[in-house]
């Protein structure tokens, strides 16, 4: 799921795959050909997170910016 937070909505490249059971929140940029697995949480609620082209975030990983 993609969630807006404090006026920031994640930007996801068309060629990226975000699993329906993943959570992407706030100030997040997901590049091309990126894979976000089930249970992953990418929380850009207090700062920007950039997942660059070709990267992957595997199952149940958390990426959080304070």
Please annotate each region the language model reported.
Residues 2-9:
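A detector for short, charged/polar N-terminal pre-domain segments
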